[in-house]
Amino acid sequence: MRAKSAIFSRTSLSLCSARLLASSQWVPSSSRNSSAISSRLNPSRCADFTNFTRTTSASP
């Protein structure tokens, strides 16, 4: 179970960095998406997301 959660958090982290890259290269058509994804993308927000997924996947 621990390995699965590690893989899951790693996937979410790569998703986060991919989103960072994507948002710096193109602007989403929906302004709501752009504000949500790219509120001048705080790394802390990415960290919060990975922490959230780690805690939820770690819980039984």
UniProtKB/Swiss-Prot annotation:
One of its GO terms (biological process) is response to mercury ion. Keywords: Mercuric resistance, Plasmid, Transposable element. Part of the mercury resistance operon (mer). This is Putative mercuric resistance protein. It comes from Shigella flexneri.
